[in-house]
């Protein structure tokens, strides 16, 4: 019972780290990448579809992304979605491809993105801690019900705390890496 609780907690903590990693990928750095567009959705045949499922991406230059839609009919919708996103770019459409040139990030904008990254990291840490709290409650309930002994309950809580520290540490490492990436000129 306790092993199941700990395994479930670990899976949820891994998922929280993965979501944080995906959130970081969507934050623009000095170099654009296809992941920059992963959170942008387009209405395509009545369904909201991520841009990265509607087109292929190439990065021919450090500050340019070329988007080649699989369906040319989706081009205006993709262009509009990118223009209205919070990327701060103006895509140009030549009929076959969409070119997106990213301006250099100003120091102010870099610091803004660092704040966004810190907020996303804190959200991730909070998710991990919430998972810990839920698992701890389940362990406490099992001890009170007499399903497990107090010693086993304490051992399980120590394991849970170690898991929590491990995954919070992973999020902190991701944040440190993202901050250095953002502040690199």
Swiss-Prot record:
It is found in: Cytoplasm. One of its GO terms (cellular component) is cytoplasm. Keywords: Cytoplasm, Protein biosynthesis. Gene3D superfamilies: 3.30.1360.40, Ribosome-recycling factor. One of its GO terms (molecular function) is ribosomal large subunit binding. InterPro entries: Ribosome_recyc_fac, Ribosome_recyc_fac_dom, RRF_sf. One of its GO terms (biological process) is translational termination. Its main location: cytoplasm. It holds the Pfam family RRF. Coiled coil: none annotated. Disulfide bonds: none annotated. Belongs to the RRF family. Responsible for the release of ribosomes from messenger RNA at the termination of protein biosynthesis. May increase the efficiency of translation by recycling ribosomes from one round of translation to another. This is Ribosome-recycling factor. It comes from Thermobifida fusca (strain YX). The lineage of its organism: Bacteria, Bacillati, Actinomycetota, Actinomycetes, Streptosporangiales.
